[in-house]
A protein has these predicted regions:
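His/Met- and acidic-residue-enriched segments that coordinate or traffic transition-metal cofactors
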Residues: 1-134
Length: 134
């Protein structure tokens, strides 16, 4: 339901924001650095929108990345150039593959039009990121 979606979506924003900030400075390819800037901005605005939407419903959103994601964030911070790019592409491709069905399910099942709109917008952004890393 909406609560589970909001929590997964929040986690995605936290992790995408952290990894994208590393991409801005550690990426070997300049297009990945630029993509990092875009993703960091998107994740921040998505999180702001989500926080606003769930505020009246007393839904607790995660504020930190899960342990396995924290390890990934740490590894990315330690890498530079092509090594960074390889791991970042792998992470982003996996993240998109995992999140698309979550977003699709929310779009189909939710009666909250604002959450549906947010899910649709995010889905479009993930598709755009996917094209850039192929």
């Amino acid at each position: 339901g909406d609560i589970a979606f909001a929590q997964k979506f929040s986690t995605m924003n936290i992790v995408q924001s952290a990894t994208a900030k590393s991409a801005e400075t550690h990426a070997g390819r300049s297009d990945f650095a630029t993509l990092g800037t875009t993703i960091a901005q998107d994740a921040t605005s998505q999180q702001t929108a989500l926080t606003t939407l769930v505020a009246p419903h007393a839904i607790a959103l995660p504020t930190t990345a899960p342990k396995e994601d924290q390890m990934l964030i740490k590894r990315l911070k330690a890498l530079h150039g092509p090594a960074f790019d390889r791991l970042y592409i792998r992470y982003l491709a996996r993240e998109i593959t995992l999140m698309k069905p979550v977003l699709d399910a929310e779009i189909l099942a939710s009666s909250n039009t604002d959450l549906v709109k947010l899910a649709k917008n995010t889905n479009a952004k993930l598709s755009a990121y996917q094209e850039q890393i192929q």
